[in-house]
């Protein structure tokens, strides 16, 4: 019998090649999976960071709300200190210099659009003696959150007639006073944000008008 020649047979080479190709395919699949997981993780982290930033901004602006007149209610003829609707609220608060010229500004927080692609925006307008002052370099409304499916604002405060604490109201009817609490619920990307509940320190329990 002739001895077997040294080296690999064609079958062995083919098997080794198939194993190598299979190993490379598995390695590339693992890399793609890891890359996809990493990208999803980064996207989630960015959304979470954006959510926290928007929540903190809203908390700071609402907690800075002041009992300063933004105009006169045409029905009651009383100064308007706070206007709260299901998807819009308007109030006065001082702003830091990087947001404007300092001093009180009208904050107009509203939901734009409908359906599944709504946008939460804020517009700032200078206030002087209860009147809106248009600035020459006024900034347009800023986007706080886009691609939002649902946004709702609710308000809680003292009923001026009974003096009792109200439940959560979709409409703040007493424009001549600040609510005690404001709640904001946002849903985007198929998930609900943590509810934002803010106490308004300057409400004073009844929102007395600042002189």
From Swiss-Prot:
GO terms for cellular component: membrane. Residues 1-7 form a propeptide. It is found in: Membrane. It is a single-pass membrane protein. InterPro entries: N_methyl_site (IPR012902). One of its GO terms (biological process) is protein transport. Keywords: Membrane, Methylation, Protein transport, Transmembrane, Transmembrane helix, Transport. Signal peptide: none annotated. The modification N-methylphenylalanine is found at residue 8. It comes from the Bacteria. The chain crosses the membrane at residues 8-28. Involved in a type II secretion system (T2SS, formerly general secretion pathway, GSP) for the export of proteins. Belongs to the GSP J family. This is Type II secretion system protein J. The lineage of its organism: Bacteria, Pseudomonadati, Pseudomonadota, Gammaproteobacteria, Lysobacterales. The gene is xpsJ.
